[in-house]
Amino acid sequence: MTLLVEILEAPKITSPGVTEANAPLPEALRDVAAEAGIRMVHLEGPALQLDIRPTMGPGAAWGDFDGDGWVDLFLPQGAGRPEQDPLPHRLFRNQGDGTFEDISSVAGLGGGDASMGALAFDADGDGQLDLYLACQGADRFFLGNGNGTFRDASDLLPPTDLWSASVSAADYDQDGDLDLYVTRYLEYDPRLLPPESEAGGMRREDPLPMLPYLFPGQPNQLLRNDLKDGTLGFSDVAVELGVHDPKTR
């Protein structure tokens, strides 16, 4: 289930001290996702109580993907259930009146990826927002066309088969283009889970292999943007610069 929260009233502090324990609090937040037209259920991995993948929600990326001056919303989808067809990633176009239109079917963003994070940024300096998807498995990268549609450019990324958790952008080498730092999660092996027939008798506090700290971490990536003369590419320089941090999650 997706939530879009509207701030109704920010907390007000008029004087220091302790308030009455039973004093009524004003309604400060309200979920407006349904009335705004944002509907998505993130599905990832088998629906087992002990599988860690269904517990990991997706990220979100805000940005004006169609150049109309309104901030749109991208929600990455998971890989779905094993018995289902792949589900599409979702792009919601802001209509400027507090509502959104689902344009996923024409956005060219595909689906079926086990996505955990997303970032909107301008990779090639053309003024159009591009999208990076952090996934379990190969990450995905899409170049924006500036009209709410994208083209797949994942082949520009160094090949990996890890579990990405999040991604951020900054010009670390001060050459005028944005580089990427991709954090990795863990070496997850679902074969270590108890049989499905035993899942109903397990409790969350039981010392089972689903706990993240029982799995080894994966090294992070620093993807240097090698944009030159209009040609885009990325090189992983995390080990070279000592920022791969292989033991954390």
Where are these regions (language model features)?
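Acidic, glycine/proline-rich Ca2+-coordinating loop motifs
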Residues: 1-249
